[in-house]
């Protein structure tokens, strides 16, 4: 990016933790970055507060019933920001000239349409919505390639691989990539101990500040399983070339092993502002507000194999990747329903992988030849998981 050009950034999911980190980086560089569009799901008061601070040209609330509150709130603040509501408005703005860069941070499958719209329009896509890749990875990467869109991953692990691969012409020289995992807050516990885990315990991640759904995914290691599927789509690698290592310090974010015996790794403090700064300024580097890594102070780096017996979600994700077609979409949808039920206290922690496995084995796999096919598989998986939940409630 030329130093004199102003990058117009849309932040989808602005009221979440990734949105907050993105806006922090943007605010540090007013001479080169501007938040031109902010969106939120239903947190209209938080969205208004962000608009007052960042003064975007446009603000979108997904819940159309909250449009009057957004419109009137912007007027009361004396802002020229235009109010919009609904998914169609967001998709249209993502496709238009309001932005050249999109931070896709809407949680869950709800983020897919706007992510696809941005890709279709050839935008730089800072992808934090992992469900877009898991649900429709082939479609998204194909769409981006056809439109000349640039996908830069924001997950720390995929950003690390992106940075390592961009350091050389490595298109044919990769032996494998190794995703690191913190192990979550319950690393080392057996299934008997995991049965007693509460939602409050599961959302308290020891290293990263994240929303509740992603925190639970980290606790079950489904987060890492989804990242394996993402890495397959982002970097064109089969599952056999994607490994996972538990690294509790969360300082080595991922590694790339090359055929010549070299291994490159990217290290840094666990802070999403680093990867967002990479995506916003690439190929340049800008201050993210994150300090440097003091290895002497850290003292040690530990690595261990993941325990897939205690945390079967990682195994289920590999199973879905090997099955291909609609299987990853089924995995993702079942997990969203199961995690939501756990957070609401309807089921225990160990019910999450059990429900996901039930749905994966119940639904037949089909070729993922269109978005409609994928969305139908998503809807079917949700119905089957909800039915299994109702059965669980009756027999609890």
Swiss-Prot record:
Keyword list, A-Z: Isoprene biosynthesis, Manganese, Metal-binding, NADP, Oxidoreductase
Cofactor: Mg(2+); Mn(2+)
Enzyme class: oxidoreductase
GO molecular function: 1-deoxy-D-xylulose-5-phosphate reductoisomerase activity; manganese ion binding; NADPH binding
Signal peptide limits: none
The organism's place on the tree of life at top rank: Bacteria
Keyword Repeat: no
UniProt binding sites for 1-deoxy-D-xylulose 5-phosphate: 130, 156-157, 182, 205, 218, 223-224, 227
Pathway per the UniProt entry: Isoprenoid biosynthesis; isopentenyl diphosphate biosynthesis via DXP pathway; isopentenyl diphosphate from 1-deoxy-D-xylulose 5-phosphate: step 1/6
Annotated Pfam families: DXP_redisom_C (PF08436), DXP_reductoisom (PF02670), DXPR_C (PF13288)
Binding site for NADPH: 15-18, 41, 129, 131, 211
GO biological process: isopentenyl diphosphate biosynthetic process, methylerythritol 4-phosphate pathway involved in terpenoid biosynthetic process
Catalytic activity annotation: 2-C-methyl-D-erythritol 4-phosphate + NADP(+) = 1-deoxy-D-xylulose 5-phosphate + NADPH + H(+)
SUPFAM superfamilies (alphabetical): 1-deoxy-D-xylulose-5-phosphate reductoisomerase, C-terminal domain, Glyceraldehyde-3-phosphate dehydrogenase-like, C-terminal domain, NAD(P)-binding Rossmann-fold domains
EC number in record: 1.1.1.267
Role this protein plays: Catalyzes the NADPH-dependent rearrangement and reduction of 1-deoxy-D-xylulose-5-phosphate (DXP) to 2-C-methyl-D-erythritol 4-phosphate (MEP).
Family: Belongs to the DXR family.
PANTHER family (UniProt xref): 1-DEOXY-D-XYLULOSE 5-PHOSPHATE REDUCTOISOMERASE, 1-DEOXY-D-XYLULOSE 5-PHOSPHATE REDUCTOISOMERASE, CHLOROPLASTIC
This protein's name: 1-deoxy-D-xylulose 5-phosphate reductoisomerase
């Amino acid at each position: 990016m030329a130093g004199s050009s102003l990058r117009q950034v849309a932040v989808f999911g602005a009221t979440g933790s990734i949105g907050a980190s993105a806006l922090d980086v943007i605010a540090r560089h007013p001479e080169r970055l501007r938040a031109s569009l902010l969106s939120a799901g239903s947190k209209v008061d938080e969205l208004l507060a962000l608009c007052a601070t960042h003064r975007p040209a446009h603000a979108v609330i997904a819940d159309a019933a909250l449009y009057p509150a957004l419109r009137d709130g912007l007027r009361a603040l004396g802002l020229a920001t235009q109010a919009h509501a609904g998914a169609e408005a967001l998709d249209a703005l993502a496709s238009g000239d309001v932005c050249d860069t999109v931070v896709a941070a809407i949680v869950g499958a709800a983020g897919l349409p706007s992510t696809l719209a941005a890709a279709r329009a050839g935008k730089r896509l800072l992808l934090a919505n992992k469900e877009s890749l898991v649900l429709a990875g082939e479609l998204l990467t194909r769409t981006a390639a056809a439109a000349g869109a640039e996908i830069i991953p924001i997950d720390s692990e995929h950003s690390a691989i992106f940075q390592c691969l961009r350091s050389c012409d490595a298109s044919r020289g990769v032996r494998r990539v190794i995703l690191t995992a913190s192990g979550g807050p319950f690393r080392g516990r057996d299934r008997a101990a995991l049965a007693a885990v509460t939602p409050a315990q599961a959302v308290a991640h020891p290293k990263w500040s994240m929303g509740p759904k992603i925190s639970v995914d980290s606790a079950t290691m489904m987060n890492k399983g989804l990242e394996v599927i993402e890495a397959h789509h982002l970097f064109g690698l089969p599952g056999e070339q994607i490994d996972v290592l538990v690294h509790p310090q969360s300082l080595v974010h991922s590694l790339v092993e090359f055929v010549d015996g070299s291994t490159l790794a990217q290290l840094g403090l666990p802070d999403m502002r680093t990867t967002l700064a990479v995506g916003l300024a690439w190929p340049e580097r800008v201050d993210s507000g994150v300090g440097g890594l003091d290895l002497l102070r850290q003292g040690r780096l530990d690595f261990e194999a993941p325990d897939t017996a205690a945390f079967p979600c990682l195994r289920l994700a590999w199973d879905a990747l090997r099955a291909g077609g609609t299987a990853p979409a089924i995995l993702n949808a079942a997990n969203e329903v199961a995690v939501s039920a756990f957070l609401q206290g309807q089921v225990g922690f160990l019910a999450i992988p059990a429900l996901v496995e039930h749905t994966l084995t119940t639904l037949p796999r089909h070729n993922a030849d269109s978005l409609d096919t994928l969305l139908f598989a998503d809807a079917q998986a949700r119905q089957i998981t909800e039915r299994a939940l109702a059965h669980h409630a009756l027999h609890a």
